[in-house]
Amino acid sequence: MDLPIVLSHKTAWLYHNVARPSEPLSRASSLYDEDSLANEAEPTASLPKLGLDAKGLRASTAVEIVADYLVSLGVPREELDHIDTLVNFDFERSTPAGFRCHVFGAPVPPGHLIEVAEGLLVVDEAMCFVQAGSWMSESEQLEYGYEICARYHLNHLSTGDYIEMGQRYTVADLIAYCNENRSRQGAVRAAAVLKRVHDGARSPMETATAIMVVAKRSQGGLGYAKIELNHRVDVPNEFKYLAKAGYFEIDVYAPASGTGIEYNGSDHLDKQRSASDAERMTVLSALGFRMIVLTGTQFAHQLQLHRAMNAIALAMGLKCDRSEAFQKRQNDLREFVIRHWDGGL
């Protein structure tokens, strides 16, 4: 069995769902440079030893080893009917049962490979994002772009809550990868999706709010991509008597119209939090921002969210599409963005 094995495509996405860490992982120097891998002494010493380097290892056994490792991390076994792998060139492709081998068509960029166990690598999320177009819908890939560039992590394979974490990639990082690999499959579509992705979402519902605005009209969104997330507004000295905070951040902000959209989840029901929210809205309105609040209840009901999105469109100077066909698409998008919502977001 040729080593290392490189997990890619949907298998890589499954891995990143369950194992996305808060700190950078060990980057491989090259795909098949054994010396460079051996030189990574310190990180390699802590890598799991799976037995992939055993002499005479059968491909079927390697499949079992990799599948068992992924299951141990939390990937459901039913998601592993095959394991996606990546090689540099077509002549390196093999088709043992259980593996689905993909060809990059050039030396795989070493900076986008991560060592996860001895003899096992995984493509990073920049590369995985481009590959995602081969199995994700455009809405799913749009959401994935926000998640990669977010300040939280949500495991789509678990019913657990999201966790806050540092931002691992920027939209600029993903665009740079697409530009460097434009001839690779999926890069053109990924670059188009990234025109609607923005950095720094702090929660899944903040991502959901942004997607309802930026997604194409054909997907049920408002089709308005020129927004910012968590736009900082410093309180001027002459308004500081109105607020305790020295600055505020607007969840979703459209600079051209001065429209701000806030998502208030269940945590905003706390009395002290409600008072702070009221103070914040007062100051932002006094500063000339057009502020609109979305709630979990509105996201949970089609007509309530439709009316709220009409208000947002009106504030932004956009056409309000009230046709039955658009409302159907908008509701499909609403159901998509809240599909992991447990009522507490």
Pin down the residues of each PLM region:
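Short gly/ser-rich loop at a beta-strand->alpha-helix junction or flexible surface loop bordering the NTP-binding
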Residues: M1-Q185, E324, N331-L345
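Surface segments flanking catalytic/ligand-binding clefts of nucleic-acid enzymes
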Residues: E164-L345
